Amino acid sequence: MRHYEIVFMVHPDQSEQVPGMIERYTATITGAQGTIHRLEDWGRRQLAYPINKLHKAHYVLLNVEAPQEAIDELETNFRFNDAVIRSMVMRVKHAVTEASPMVKAKDERRERREDFAEAGDDVDAGDSEE
């Protein structure tokens, strides 16, 4: 079996359906004896350019190891699902399991916010003691 990186973009009005879509697509892969190495839901993000007069889309990234039949079925599902506005399936040489730069940047921002909040609490505590 080969390794693939799959990214698909969902219409922003259909964001509520994304968990069900992810479940359906992962079931397709695991049902064909494939494995999912990484699954990231990037959420709703700004597009670089409008697609079908849309400026935002909901992004999902999958890194999988699956047979060609499962990938063909996924591509067919993407093509006939009107909620999926773009998809890309790319073959990669190795399984990728570490977090993508998108998730790493998000985690770093969260850590900075937490550090800032803690620093703000320390300053507030110092003011109340005087």
UniProtKB/Swiss-Prot annotation:
GO terms for cellular component: cytosolic small ribosomal subunit. Pfam families: Ribosomal_S6. The keyword rRNA-binding applies. GO terms for molecular function: small ribosomal subunit rRNA binding; structural constituent of ribosome. PROSITE patterns: RIBOSOMAL_S6. Residues 104-116 have a biased composition (Basic and acidic residues). Residues 117-130 have a biased composition (Acidic residues). Keywords: Ribonucleoprotein, Ribosomal protein, RNA-binding, rRNA-binding. Residues 100-130 are annotated as: Disordered. GO terms for biological process: translation. Binds together with bS18 to 16S ribosomal RNA. HAMAP family: Ribosomal_bS6. Belongs to the bacterial ribosomal protein bS6 family. This is Small ribosomal subunit protein bS6. It comes from Pectobacterium carotovorum subsp. carotovorum (strain PC1).
